[in-house]
């Protein structure tokens, strides 16, 4: 018996979609372009809203997120050592200003006593 090929000339082996790439190619494409997944969960009981959860998920590379204007990880002290340093530097500057003001006030009172 002979096996016959019943496909039309030029027909690909996967007619219902593009040829599948590797998982790495798919991940690279998603991180390069970014993907947004949005959803809402709402729980009502007798027309009384008990719970509403709004989910927004943005999956992208750091560069793509920065292009989209998202950079919260740079300012969150729990995630960025630079943010923690910035917070400490601001606190240090405030404390120095307070110390200078207190020393100035103490100098004025000791000068008035003399």
Swiss-Prot record:
Cell location: Gas vesicle
InterPro entries: Gas-vesicle_GvpA-like, GvpA, GvpA-like_CS
GO molecular function, a single term: structural molecule activity
Listed Basic and acidic residues bias regions: 1-10
The keyword Signal belongs to this UniProt entry's keyword annotation: no
Induction section of the entry: Constitutively transcribed at low levels, repressed by argR.
Domain of life: Bacteria
Residue numbers spanned by region Disordered: 1-21
GO cellular component, one term: vesicle membrane
Family the UniProt entry places it in: Belongs to the gas vesicle GvpA family.
Job description of the protein: A minor component of the gas vesicle, might be involved in nucleating gas vesicle formation. Gas vesicles (GV) are hollow, gas filled proteinaceous nanostructures. It is not clear what function GVs perform in soil bacteria.
Quaternary structure and interacting proteins, as annotated: Interacts with GvpA.
Protein name per UniProt: Probable gas vesicle protein J2
Organism: Streptomyces coelicolor (strain ATCC BAA-471 / A3(2) / M145)
Organism lineage: Bacteria, Bacillati, Actinomycetota, Actinomycetes, Kitasatosporales
């Amino acid at each position: 018996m002979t096996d016959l090929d019943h496909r039309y000339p030029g027909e690909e082996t996967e007619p219902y979609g593009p040829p599948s790439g590797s998982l790495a190619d798919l991940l690279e494409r998603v991180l390069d372009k970014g993907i947004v997944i949005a959803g809402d969960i709402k729980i009502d009981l007798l027309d009384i809203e008990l719970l509403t959860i709004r989910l927004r998920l943005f999956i992208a590379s750091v560069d793509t997120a920065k292009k989209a204007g998202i950079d919260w990880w740079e300012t969150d002290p729990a995630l960025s050592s630079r943010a923690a340093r910035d917070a400490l530097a601001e606190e240090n500057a405030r404390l120095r200003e307070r110390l200078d003001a207190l020393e100035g006030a103490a100098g004025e009172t000791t000068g008035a006593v003399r």
